[in-house]
Amino acid sequence: MRINPTTSGSGVSTLEKKNPGRVVQIIGPVLDVAFPPGKMPNIYNALVVQGRDSVGQPINVACEVQQLLGNNRVRAVAMSATDGLTRGMAVIDTGAPISVPVGGATLGRIFNVLGEPVDNLGPVDTSTTSPIHRSAPAFIQLDTKLSIFETGIKVVDLLAPYRRGGKIGLFGGAGVGKTVLIMELINNIAKAHGGVSVFGGVGERTREGNDLYMEMKESGVINKENIAESKVALVYGQMNEPPGARMRVGLTALTMAEYFRDVNEQDVLLFIDNIFRFVQAGSEVSALLGRMPSAVGYQPTLSTEMGSLQERITSTKDGSITSIQAVYVPADDLTDPAPATTFAHLDATTVLSRGLAAKGIYPAVDPLDSTSTMLQPRIVGEEHYETAQRVKQTLQRYKELQDIIAILGLDELSEEDRLLVARARKIERFLSQPFFVAEVFTGSPGKYVGLAETIRGFQLILSGELDGLPEQAFYLVGTIDEATAKAMNLEMESNLKK
């Protein structure tokens, strides 16, 4: 954390030293601090507790003011562990909210909630910082034009398109390809849109954060040789962190993304994994601050906290922040206040299916469960809308026929249904695609498929022009032309074997 956001280095100005306080109460991660009369810090100001613990080790704990209690006392939430703190320790009011480094120097690095690098690669080479608390862009700054954010991933662009500057919920269990999909999106936005990405790890497992970092280095999303050419900045506040850090790490990641949008005028992808943990941390802090719990024990300020984060994620006339948020649904209950509050903000949902992953169809995006508010003829055009609807109808009918096929076999179906099943199986395989970031695992070069090419490919399958081609020709290819070329190769190979 840059204690004084107006200077290039850490430190506390002489003015700030004139406003010292004292710790008077410690309740876990929540501290009560007394200040001299008339020198109370503002809400959201960063405080720093300084001193030594019982074995003489220096203590430097940053906190954020949450409440003014009266009697010259404030209540603050710690951003790191409060082990070793005692009453009477000196506290310094920094006079400003937590500020974090922003700009190109953050790419390829890992930060904590305070904007301090935690990757052992030395200090961040930037003097530019920004406070994590800001208001959402004004109405006059917003870009109200509805436009699609092309990802180059066929199943997403055709059936559940992302809105530029929108919010997408990513639903999927362990091992269905969530991380690989996230890395491919980071790669594609950098190549196709010249954009960058910010990844906020909110309250998830430290092991997963480490795995993601290693996989990003392996796939080239983070450039090991030249860190400055990396495509993503990582901000972690994992499960072992105090609730204050988990509650604010999403804002730290968002602040870094806002700089790329507002100053660099870029399109930015912001990943939040997991948005439920943001709510959960807020719930823990709320109870510690003495607020009366609301429905299901959640904080009474749930909607306000969610809104203050989500409303800053938007398109302006300068650039856009498109956010992809992993959503954990507690006990699979979609009516739980945490996911229910999140759904109100989402423009699209991408659901990953274990059944498709088991078939080896990657990305394992469920074409029938995934939805988007953008899939309307007035937004995407009649051709795109009609093609998407026909693809969904074909897949839905195939799903209905699967029980009959399992019991009686394909031969018992009518001629029309057999033809429909053959096309549905081709569509299902054509929805798969080789990824750039998975080249090291699959050996197949990655493919970016434009929207027009995607629509043309599915129209050809639906029209029946490609009924004579084998279904394996459509598996893990980019465009429809590659599928026809693959079919010719398969035919030549089978002829040679004869």
UniProtKB/Swiss-Prot annotation:
In terms of superkingdom, the source organism counts as: Eukaryota
Q: Where in the cell is it found?
A: Plastid, Chloroplast thylakoid membrane
Q: Which GO terms describe its cellular component?
A: chloroplast thylakoid membrane; mitochondrion; proton-transporting ATP synthase complex
The UniProt record lists the EC number as: 7.1.2.2
Q: What is catalysed by this protein?
A: ATP + H2O + 4 H(+)(in) = ADP + phosphate + 5 H(+)(out)
- A Pfam family annotated for this chain is ATP-synt_ab
Q: Which residues cross the membrane?
A: none
Q: Which HAMAP family match?
A: ATP_synth_beta_bact
Give the similarity note: Belongs to the ATPase alpha/beta chains family.
Spell out the subunit comment: F-type ATPases have 2 components, CF(1) - the catalytic core - and CF(0) - the membrane proton channel. CF(1) has five subunits: alpha(3), beta(3), gamma(1), delta(1), epsilon(1). CF(0) has four main subunits: a(1), b(1), b'(1) and c(9-12).
Name of this chain's protein: ATP synthase subunit beta, chloroplastic
From which organism does this entry originate? Answer: Solanum bulbocastanum (Wild potato)
